[in-house]
């Protein structure tokens, strides 16, 4: 029997991309190289393409996963997150890092998404989110899955790191869940060499993510009333150095967006 080989990925960075980056770096004065206007421009363009109101660029898809679950921990102190065994390790590790309990649900072989009969049996009062992975460009959504989330008041998180542009009922996946994550790793459908983005229609969740992207600093929040509420609750602290909770630097280098 002949061996069949289908490459999973190839480097999609070409000479034109490299030259564009060189020209950007050769500007005078030297452009801002981290979290500048190009990042905001990209976030807005991505939101228009996907159909989500709030979009936050980070330095990798893995960081998008970790930051999403860290922000979820601001909404719920503990609980369980259901996820498939067929996923990338960062989905699982992000749940563990934020001290949620990962609960694994087997997949079906039709779309490599959850076996919904098994999923229903795993839902408990402690279930905080269902973390879906769209595998290799295959849509993992069904009406039944969306109804399960709605009926049980459970957040749906979509991992779309390897399924950019996949659709379900005429809408792009990543626009259905409470929040979705994309990766722009060098071998994915669209690349910034390294990078990722968090997408949601929930402003409070977005503002939490904004703070946590930069060590947890609330001065990164753009919603003044949310920021002032935290400042007023901490009158003894310098308002420029109030941190929502322990976090990391998830910011993206602007060079990746050229």
Regions found by a protein language model. Give the residues of each.
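Conserved SAM-binding loop
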Residues: 57, 83, 198
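N-terminal "arm"/small-domain region of PLP-dependent enzymes with the aminotransferase-like
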Residues: 1-32, 244
């Amino acid at each position: 029997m002949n061996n069949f080989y289908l490459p999973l990925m190839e480097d999609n960075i070409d000479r034109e991309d490299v030259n564009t980056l060189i020209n950007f770096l050769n500007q005078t004065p030297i452009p801002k190289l981290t979290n500048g206007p190009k990042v905001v421009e990209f976030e807005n363009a991505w939101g228009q393409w996907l159909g989500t109101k709030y979009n936050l660029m980070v330095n990798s898809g893995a960081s998008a996963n970790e930051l999403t679950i860290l922000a979820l921990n601001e909404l719920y102190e503990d609980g369980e997150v259901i996820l498939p065994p067929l996923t990338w390790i960062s989905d699982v590790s992000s749940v563990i890092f934020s001290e949620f309990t990962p609960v694994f649900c087997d997949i079906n072989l039709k779309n490599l998404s959850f076996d919904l009969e098994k999923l229903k049996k795993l839902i408990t009062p402690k279930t905080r989110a269902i973390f879906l992975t769209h595998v290799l460009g295959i849509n993992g959504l069904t009406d039944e899955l969306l109804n399960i989330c709605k009926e049980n008041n459970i957040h749906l998180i979509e991992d779309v790191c390897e399924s950019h542009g996949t659709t379900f009922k005429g809408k792009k996946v990543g626009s259905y869940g409470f929040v979705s994550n994309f990766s722009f790793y060098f071998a994915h459908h669209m690349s910034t060499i390294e990078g990722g983005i968090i997408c949601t229609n929930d402003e409070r969740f977005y503002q939490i993510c904004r703070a946590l992207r930069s060590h947890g600093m609330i001065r990164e929040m753009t919603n003044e009333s949310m920021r002032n509420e935290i400042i007023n609750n901490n009158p003894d602290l310098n308002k420029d150095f109030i941190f929502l909770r322990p976090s990391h630097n998830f910011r993206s280098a602007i060079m990746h967006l050229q």
